[in-house]
Curated annotation (Swiss-Prot):
Produces ATP from ADP in the presence of a proton gradient across the membrane. The alpha chain is a regulatory subunit. It catalyses: ATP + H2O + 4 H(+)(in) = ADP + phosphate + 5 H(+)(out). GO terms for molecular function: ADP binding; ATP binding; proton-transporting ATP synthase activity, rotational mechanism. The record marks 370 as: Required for activity. Pfam families: ATP-synt_ab, ATP-synt_ab_C, ATP-synt_ab_N. This is ATP synthase subunit alpha. The keyword Ribosomal protein does not apply. It comes from Rickettsia prowazekii (strain Madrid E). GO terms for cellular component: plasma membrane; proton-transporting ATP synthase complex. Belongs to the ATPase alpha/beta chains family.
Length: 512
C-alpha cells in the first residue's frame, strides 16, 4: 500500500497536535543535605521565597532561604522521609489553607487538614496563609465591644471588635482561661438570629501539650461553643515549621469571616513559643542571630501577623477580626525581648500576676498596669456609666492599703475607702468557665460602686452577689432586659434598680 504524501503530512500534523510539550516541563532540583527539618536544595534557580516545593516522598517543603548556589527549605511534615539525593520539584505556588464555615466545629492542623476523626472538610475556598494587612483607607476605628463575660475586663480594660489586646503573664496565671471564657461567652449571641452580633472564634495552640489542648476542646464541646469555633493545632511534638505556620494559617481562616462582613475572634496561644519555633528555624538556616539569639526580623514575624486584625470600613463590608495574642513571661519580666515587641504592636495589654492569683484574686488581672488603648469607645453606654470611676477607686484603695501597713491609726474616711476598695475587689472576682452576661455585670458593678455592699461582710460579698443575681433573674427580669435593649441606664431603670436593691439588701441583712 502506497501512502500519498499529503496523507502522511496530515497524519504527522494530527500526532504533533496531540503532544502537549508544556505538561512535560518541570523544574527539578536535588537535595544536597538534610537534617533537623531543614533541606538544602541545588538546581531550583527560579524558585521564589515562600514557594512550596514537593519532595520525592510527597512531603512538602517551604522555601525560606535563597542563596547563590542553593536554596534552604523547611520540611512541613516527617523529615525522615526526605533523603540526600532525592529529587525536588517546584509547585509554582505559595502555601494555601482551606477556609470557610465548613471548618467550624473542627480541629485541624497547621495546614488545614482535619485531625479530629470526623471525616473530610467540604469547602472549595482556599486562601494564601501570608496575606497583606488591610490599608488605612480600608479600616475604620474600633467602636463595637467584644464581650468577654469577665467583669474585670469588660468594665476596666474593654476589648473592641478589630482590636489586638495582649494577654500577658507568668505560667499558670489563667491566661488561657480568659481566652476560653471569651469563646464560651459568645454562645448567647450565636443562639440569636442577628448575624451582626455573632463572633466566630478561632483558637490556635502553638507548642502546647496535646493533653492541655484536648481538655480545652472538651470544655468547649461541653459548653456548646465548638459549633462556632475552629481549633488549629501545632503541638510541641510537631515540627518547628508547622508551629511557625499555624498562626498565619489560622489568621487566613479568620480573614474569611472578616472579608465577608462577619466578625471573628482569634486567640494565639502563645506567641512566645511561636517566636522560639521561628528562632529554631532561623538558626538551622544559618541566619545571623541577634538579641536572645532571635533573628533580626522577629519583630516583623509578629507585626505582620497582628496587623491583619482589623475593623473593616462600611465599603469593605464592615467585618472585623479581633486578635488576643498570649505571651508567657518568666518571673514577671515584661521587659524581655518578645514581650516588649508584642506590647508595642498591640492596642493594649491585660497583665496577669501570680501574686494576685495566689491571693485568690481570680482572674488575676493587675488593673493598675493593664490598659486598653481603645478605651471606653468599645463599651456600651450603660457600662461606661457604672464603671467610669472603678479604676480610680481601685488605684486609691491600693495606695491607701499600702499606706495603712505602716500604722493602725487611720481616720474614718480612709478606713471607709479601704473597706469600699476591698468590696470592689471582691465583686470583680469570678470563677473560671462562668462568663457573665453584660447586663448582669452592670448590675454587679453598680452595686459595688454605689456602696450598697458597705453593710455586707467581705467574706459574704460573693454569696450576696450570687443571691442578688438569682433574685433579679427570677423576679425582676425586666430590669436586665431594659439594660440589654436600651444599652444605657435611664432614670427609670435606675429607680427600679435602686428600689429592688434596697428591698433585697434589707431582706438579706435580716438573714445574716
Amino acid at each position: 500500500m502506497k501512502l500519498n504524501p499529503i496523507e502522511v503530512a496530515e497524519i504527522l500534523q494530527k500526532e504533533i497536535a496531540n503532544i502537549n510539550f508544556l505538561s512535560e516541563l518541570e523544574e527539578v532540583g536535588q537535595v544536597i543535605s538534610v537534617g533537623d527539618g531543614i533541606a538544602k536544595i541545588y538546581g531550583l534557580a527560579n524558585v521564589k521565597s515562600g514557594e512550596v516545593v514537593e519532595f520525592k516522598s510527597g512531603v512538602k517543603g517551604l522555601i525560606l532561604n535563597l542563596e547563590n548556589d542553593s536554596v534552604g527549605a523547611v520540611i512541613m511534615g516527617d523529615y525522615s522521609k526526605v533523603k540526600q539525593g532525592d529529587n525536588v520539584k517546584r509547585t509554582k505556588d505559595v502555601l494555601k489553607v482551606l477556609v470557610g464555615k465548613a471548618l467550624l466545629g473542627r480541629t485541624v492542623d497547621a495546614l488545614g487538614n482535619p485531625i479530629d476523626g470526623k471525616g473530610d472538610i467540604v469547602s472549595k475556598e482556599y486562601r494564601h496563609i501570608e496575606m497583606k494587612a488591610p490599608g488605612i483607607i480600608e479600616r475604620m476605628s474600633v467602636s463595637e465591644p467584644v464581650q468577654t463575660g469577665i467583669k474585670a475586663i469588660d468594665s476596666l480594660i474593654p476589648i473592641g471588635r478589630g482590636q489586638r489586646e495582649l494577654i500577658i503573664g507568668d505560667r499558670q496565671t489563667g491566661k488561657t482561661a480568659i481566652a476560653v471564657d471569651t469563646i464560651i461567652n459568645q454562645k448567647q449571641a450565636h443562639s440569636l438570629t442577628n448575624e451582626s452580633d455573632k463572633i466566630y472564634c478561632i483558637y490556635v495552640a502553638i507548642g502546647q501539650k496535646r493533653s492541655s489542648v484536648a481538655q480545652i476542646v472538651k470544655k468547649l464541646e461541653d459548653a456548646g461553643a465548638m459549633d462556632y469555633t475552629i481549633v488549629v493545632l501545632a503541638t510541641a511534638s510537631e515540627a518547628a515549621s508547622l508551629q511557625f505556620i499555624a498562626p498565619y494559617s489560622a489568621c487566613s481562616m479568620g480573614e474569611y469571616f472578616r472579608d465577608n462582613g462577619m466578625h471573628a475572634l482569634i486567640i494565639y496561644d502563645d506567641l512566645s513559643k511561636h517566636a522560639v519555633a521561628y528562632r529554631q528555624i532561623s538558626l538551622l538556616l544559618r541566619r545571623p542571630p541577634g538579641r536572645e539569639a532571635y533573628p533580626g526580623d522577629v519583630f516583623y514575624l509578629h507585626s505582620r501577623l497582628l496587623e491583619r486584625a482589623a475593623k473593616m470600613s462600611k465599603e469593605k463590608g464592615g467585618g472585623s477580626l479581633t486578635a488576643l495574642p498570649i505571651i508567657e513571661t518568666q518571673a514577671g519580666d515584661v521587659s524581655a525581648y518578645i514581650p516588649t515587641n508584642v506590647i508595642s504592636i498591640t492596642d493594649g495589654q491585660i497583665f496577669l500576676e501570680s501574686d494576685l492569683f495566689y491571693k485568690g484574686i481570680r482572674p488575676a488581672v493587675n488593673v493598675g498596669i493593664s490598659v486598653s488603648r481603645v478605651g471606653s469607645a468599645a463599651q456600651i453606654k450603660a457600662m461606661k456609666q457604672v464603671a467610669g470611676s472603678v479604676k480610680l477607686e481601685l488605684a486609691q484603695f491600693r495606695e491607701r492599703e499600702s499606706f495603712s501597713q505602716f500604722g493602725s491609726d487611720l481616720d474614718p474616711a480612709t478606713k471607709a475607702q479601704i473597706e469600699h476598695g476591698k468590696r470592689l475587689v471582691e465583686i470583680l472576682k469570678q470563677d473560671q468557665y462562668h462568663p457573665c452576661p453584660v447586663e448582669e455585670q452592670i448590675v454587679s458593678i453598680y452595686v459595688g460602686t454605689k456602696k450598697y455592699l458597705n453593710d455586707i461582710p467581705i467574706q459574704k460579698v460573693k454569696e450576696f452577689e450570687e443571691a442578688m443575681l438569682a433574685e433579679i433573674r427570677l423576679n425582676k427580669k425586666d430590669i436586665l432586659e431594659s439594660i440589654k435593649t436600651e444599652q444605657c441606664i435611664t432614670e427609670e431603670i435606675e429607680q427600679k434598680l435602686k428600689a429592688f436593691l434596697e428591698n433585697f439588701i434589707q431582706a438579706y441583712c435580716v438573714m445574716l
